[in-house]
UniProtKB/Swiss-Prot annotation:
Upper lineage: Eukaryota, Metazoa, Ecdysozoa, Nematoda, Chromadorea
Occurrences of domain UBC core (ranges): 169-324
Function: Possible negative regulator of polyubiquitination. May modulate the activity of the p38 MAP kinase pnk-3. May have a role in axon termination and synaptic transmission at motor and mechanosensory neurons. Plays a role in intraflagellar transport in cilia and cilium length regulation.
Gene3D superfamilies xref list: Ubiquitin Conjugating Enzyme
Record field: compositional bias (Polar residues): 18-32
Alphabetized SUPFAM superfamilies for the sequence: UBC-like
Protein name: Ubiquitin-conjugating enzyme E2 variant 3
Subcellular location: Nucleus; Cytoplasm; Cell projection, Dendrite; Cell projection, Axon
Organism, scientific name: Caenorhabditis elegans
Family, per entry: Belongs to the ubiquitin-conjugating enzyme family.
GO biological process, one term: DNA damage response
Region spans: Disordered: 1-83
GO cellular component: axon; cilium; cytoplasm; dendrite; nucleus
GO molecular function: ubiquitin conjugating enzyme activity
């Protein structure tokens, strides 16, 4: 190269080949404008420096209710409506459909309140007449008449008293219908009334003759509970285990299907339980799979449906073990004490988890 100054040509730029196109993406802005930069400073202002907001508009209390004069035509109701008025009362009755038609005719909002005009003196007379009524109640225990006369009658308390007295009537009628069964064996069942608890009966049930539970003695409690519609609901709880699909985990017998009425007595319960023990095979055969799963012990009901000989053999074994049954005419160890309740089974669950 020469050190002498001279003219030189600028370097030639390389032209892009036509086959390749260079694409350049637009750079994403990363700088935050100065007016939008976050401020982390905390500034303490004096009370005089705090900016004051604009005062709220003055509140105007709406006018009291406005009453339309009596017998105003329906076409003139819209003349009495004002925005500053709280409510507009109509002293005579107007059908809602007529108000809707009037609103459509006026092409506006109708906000009237339609009320029936009643003379206050008539209402006052009705109230006094109601308070002066004498309510007579018959007490079943003391056979006395209770007179409750007006001046501050508590009608809610009065309804509770009537309900309790009605329940007493139902309980007394049931006890009178069932008391003759005490100490008598009816359909293989004998009961004793619990003197400490009302409507509690201790029952001893003999296994039905000809059934798979024959020879066993089963102890149960029958509890009658009042219900809200002036009726009684029976509940049966066994203290002796029965290999039966209607017996629940805690000894409760399934009461669905019982023909129980207000005039029923304990004999209806006896027949229902005994027939359920005697006709267990027929009851299982007529049920479908969903009904078997709905029973108290689905595993036992499935066994009875699929393998009846095994179910029958297992049920007889439990009768001999738990209910003092007999083997070939000879009494087992538990048969000697079959009339005495076994206390060691009172507080235990009698559920069968698996069957081998």
């Amino acid at each position: 190269m020469s050190d002498q100054p001279g003219t030189s040509r600028p370097p030639l730029r390389a032209e892009p080949t036509p086959t390749k196109t260079a694409t350049r993406r637009r750079a994403r802005p990363i700088a935050i404008p100065s007016d939008e930069t976050p401020r982390n400073e905390v500034t303490f202002l004096r009370p005089s420096e705090v900016p004051q907001r604009k005062p709220l508009p003055e509140y105007r209390e709406p006018q009291p209710r406005k009453t339309v004069p009596k017998n105003v035509p329906l076409e003139d109701l819209h003349n009495y409506h004002r925005e500053e008025c709280l409510n507009v009362s109509i002293p005579h009755f107007i059908n809602t459909e007529d108000l809707i038609k009037e609103s459509q005719r006026v092409n506006g909002l109708i906000s009237f309140r339609s009320t029936n005009f009643v003379d206050p003196s008539v209402i006052l007379k009705e109230i006094k007449k109601k308070e002066e009524e004498t309510v007579t109640l018959m007490d079943n225990d003391k056979n006395s008449i209770i007179d409750i006369v007006g001046d501050g009658i508590n009608y809610e308390k009065l309804k509770k008293v009537e309900k309790s007295l009605c329940q007493i009537d139902i309980i007394t009628e049931f006890m009178n219908r069932s008391r003759h069964l005490q100490g008598k064996k009816v359909n293989g069942c004998i009961m004793r009334i619990d003197e400490t608890k009302q409507l509690l009966f201790h029952v001893i049930i003999d296994g039905p003759v000809g059934s798979i539970y024959e020879g066993g003695t089963f102890f149960a409690d029958i509890n009658i509970q009042p219900y809200q519609n002036h009726s009684l609901i029976p509940r049966v709880c066994f203290h002796t285990f029965i290999f039966h699909p209607n017996l629940g985990k805690y000894g409760n017998w399934d009461m669905r299907g019982i023909q129980w009425e207000r005039r029923s007595n304990l004999e209806v319960l006896y027949n229902f339980i005994v027939e359920g023990m005697r006709n267990v095979k027929y009851d299982i055969e007529r049920r479908n799979l969903a009904q078997l799963e709905d029973m108290s012990q689905p595993n036992i009901s499935r066994l009875a449906k699929e393998d009846w000989p095994k179910f029958e053999r297992t049920a007889r074994e439990f009768v001999m073990k738990m209910a003092g049954g007999t083997i070939n005419g000879r009494k087992t160890i538990f048969a000697e004490t079959k009339k005495r309740r076994r206390q060691d089974f009172l507080d235990e669950d009698i559920d069968v988890i698996g069957i081998s």
